[in-house]
Amino acid sequence: MEAPKLDILKPVLQHIFAAFDQVEGEYPFELQSQEIGIVTSLGHGIARATGLLQVQSEELVKFPGDRMGLAFNLDPDEVGLILLDDGHSLKAGCEVQRTGRVLDVPVGEGLLGRVVDATGRPLDQRGLVTAQERRPVEREAPAIMDRAPVTVPLQTGIKAIDALIPIGRGQRELIVGDRQTGKTAIAVDTILNQKDQDVICVYCAIGQRSSAVAKLIAELRNRGAMDYCIVVVAEGEASPGLQYITPYAATTMAEYFMEQGQDVLIVYDDLIQHARAYRELSLLLRRPPGREAFPGDIFYIHARLLERATCLRPELGGGSLTALPIVETEAQNLSAYIPTNLVSITDGQIYLTPDLFQKGIFPAVDVGKSVSRVGGKAQLPAYRDVAGDLRLSYTQFEELESFARFGTRLEESTRQSLERGRRVREVLQQPQFQPLPVAEQIAVMLAVTQGQFDLVPIEQVSQAQQLIGEAIRRELPNICDRIQNAGQLSETDRETLLNWIANHILKDSDNEL
């Protein structure tokens, strides 16, 4: 009787075990381990934790309440973490969990016109950011063989810079000067001048006042610049960890467009605040201090950031990333630690002096201390022909003017040189938010360097150049188009411009002006 019962149960058991095997195949059960540590101390934007034995350098970690941080110090007994959010709700004893990944940010067309923080979270109350993909904030700079020479100009729309300190696409040009000398104004005017130039702009605000950033964003929006601009913000009250990663995150967002073959301009405002945030983190985490209490790798953190700005070879799309880092000096001390580091890293600097600013000369560019090491090769041929010797002659004029203050009797030729130099200085002045097209710049610079402004009273020079700009757009559009498209100024066009300006604008300065 027992054997028939077993025969009946056998197919039932086989069916049950087969069902078990099928479920196991469809729903694999795997144990997932999580490494969780305990926060032992917390404050001033950093935390220390134990129990994270396998955590890696700069790995993203998660605190309660979806607060995020980065592993910064890997000591034998504990891990030093930097907070990317405010830590008001955190306390010693709370858990911290590994994520197994590095910090990444959204990139793509969906960021254009948006204001975000260093983690990609929106700050403009316009909903979530739509992104093509996410990329890590720390990326390797392009290799040497992947780079191309800087040959295409980036027009700032500012005469003093485009004529004397030209910038090329893919260059790194430092803007340096004391506070309230117009550093941000130059960067903003450069962004405004990229309208209709197929250049994507990224403005990175580090440690700036919220009111100042809000005013700048409003200005960009009112002038239609936000359509091609991304603003990445870490205000002064943000955690030092967030301020530290902000320029790297902004560069990752900019690199996406560069790798798509587009030209990109990025402004870092400013890197002295970035250096101070890194110094604060390093001192709190007990890293050895060096000169001015900055850690020993402060040069490296800026070098690895700015080396990501370049011009790619045509085989890689031919895109470019132009960097305009800003750094603030104290009491015109250009030889301070961070400014000298950045001067040695970048391809030139635009130095703004408070002496010129206080005299009402805007932009307050000190031509003698400013230089562009690679931009000269990218300057438009038309501009190079017009302003080729202008830098040298203008520097000589400034020295001559200083000498003339002693009351020495001057020869007639010297007096004429002084008068022309003063008119050149007047022409180079330019109010904020009024970038000029390159054709208008060249016409005005041609007129002043050829002496056509010599008989115009200095107080009327500004009005004269405004008349020239308006008139050539209206009367000589063909020459403007040739300059804009080809960058060339033929001898015929040159003579036509000079004769037309002399006969129609400056013929009778008393009546015209």
Curated annotation (Swiss-Prot):
A single cellular component GO annotation: plasma membrane-derived thylakoid membrane
Subunit comment: F-type ATPases have 2 components, CF(1) - the catalytic core - and CF(0) - the membrane proton channel. CF(1) has five subunits: alpha(3), beta(3), gamma(1), delta(1), epsilon(1). CF(0) has four main subunits: a(1), b(1), b'(1) and c(9-12).
SUPFAM superfamilies named in the record: C-terminal domain of alpha and beta subunits of F1 ATP synthase, N-terminal domain of alpha and beta subunits of F1 ATP synthase, P-loop containing nucleoside triphosphate hydrolases
NCBIfam families per UniProt: alt_F1F0_F1_al, atpA, PRK13343.1
Topology class, membrane: Peripheral membrane protein
Binding residues for ATP: 177-184
Site (Required for activity): 370
Entry's family note: Belongs to the ATPase alpha/beta chains family.
Keyword hit for Transport: yes
Catalyzed reactions: ATP + H2O + 4 H(+)(in) = ADP + phosphate + 5 H(+)(out)
GO function term, MF aspect, one: proton-transporting ATP synthase activity, rotational mechanism
Purpose of the protein: Produces ATP from ADP in the presence of a proton gradient across the membrane. The alpha chain is a regulatory subunit.
Protein name: ATP synthase subunit alpha 2
Listed EC numbers: 7.1.2.2
Gene3D superfamilies per the UniProt record, alphabetical: 2.40.30.20, ATP synthase alpha/beta chain, C-terminal domain (1.20.150.20), P-loop containing nucleotide triphosphate hydrolases (3.40.50.300)
Keywords attached to this entry: ATP synthesis, ATP-binding, CF(1), Hydrogen ion transport, Ion transport, Membrane, Nucleotide-binding, Plasmid, Thylakoid, Translocase, Transport
Localization in the cell: Cellular thylakoid membrane
UniProt keyword annotation of Cell division present: no
